[in-house]
Regions:
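Portal/gating segments that form or line small-molecule/metal binding sites
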Residues: 57-122, 126
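A transmembrane-helix-recognition feature enriched in membrane-embedded lipid enzymes
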Residues: 70-75, 201-243
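Structural motif
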Residues: 37-39, 65, 159-163, 186
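Short, Lys/Arg-enriched, disordered terminal segments
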Residues: 1-9, 101, 239-243
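Short amphipathic alpha-helical segments
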Residues: 50-51, 77, 120-121, 172-175, ...
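N-terminal nucleotide/polyanion-binding subdomain common to many enzyme families
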Residues: 1-87
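Internal alpha/beta domain cores that form substrate/cofactor-binding pockets in large enzymes
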Residues: 107-111, 115-124, 130-155, 164-195, ...
Length: 243
């Protein structure tokens, strides 16, 4: 089944089964110019409804994969095709495995120096067929960005992981797309932290139940206020259903 893009409350979301993911990745590798894969939570979803740089970058992404269960529930509630939910870490590992099986290349961008080195070391031991062609720390000075872009462009990787310490997040690759001739760009904030074992990944059972947000609230209690955009999402769904 081909990947289908639906519009939920005006926000694009892709319906991409786990079986179709490999074919889609291969298509992006063959595509002329850079590509972008984005994971979105329900709070990302609500931001995309606004007019801003972040929304623009996601709306133009080549593959938009939902993380939050509530996005799937919303699609079902409005009688639309229901997307497949992705655990970002599992999806990231699957993408790396696809690249490794075809001896493709990879560039790591983000994280602190120590964590980045540990992440690269662990990846080299796990994905032996994957060519890691470069790495660059996040939290960099603005004047260093052009050199970073040139380094990535010169390495010409099949996949660029954009991780923590990149202020523009998904918008970084979109805003610089004219400076790259190829490659898939994927923003996943926690990737370097998990790969370096500095951050513990969400328990798969907790993720399956859709309870991963509670871990985020424990780490940052202010995230409890995310309940308000979620309630607005529910109101919008009901309004759209009725009217």
């Amino acid at each position: 089944m081909a990947v289908q893009r639906i519009k939920l409350l005006g926000v694009p979301v892709d319906v991409c089964s786990k079986q179709d993911l490999e074919e889609k990745i291969l298509q992006l590798l063959e595509k002329k110019g850079p590509s972008q894969i984005s994971f979105i939570t329900i709070w990302d979803f609500m931001k995309i409804r606004c007019k801003n740089e972040y929304a623009e970058s996601i709306r133009n992404a080549d593959l938009i994969l939902p993380i939050s269960k509530s996005i799937l529930s919303g699609a079902k509630f409005l009688n639309k095709s229901v997307p497949f939910r992705y655990n970002p870490f599992d999806a990231f590992i699957s993408i790396l495995s696809i690249l490794e099986s075809r001896y493709k290349s990879f560039y790591i961008f983000g994280g602190r120096k120590k964590a980045l080195a540990a992440a690269e070391k662990n990846m080299r031991s796990t994905f032996r067929g994957l060519q890691i062609v470069g790495r660059c720390v996040g939290y960099y000075q603005k004047q260093d960005e052009e050199n970073i872009i040139q380094a990535i462009s010169k390495a010409s990787p099949s996949l660029v992981l954009v991780s923590e310490g990149i202020k523009k997040k998904d918008f970084w690759s979109y805003s610089n797309k004219e400076k790259f001739s190829s490659g898939i760009f994927l923003y996943y904030r926690d990737a370097v932290g998990i790969l370096s074992k500095r951050i513990k990944r969400v328990n798969p059972k907790v993720f399956e139940k859709g309870h991963e947000v509670w871990g985020e609230i424990i780490r940052n209690p202010l995230r409890i206020f995310l309940i308000f955009p979620f309630l607005w999402y529910i109101i919008l769904l009901v309004w759209t259903k009725l009217f």
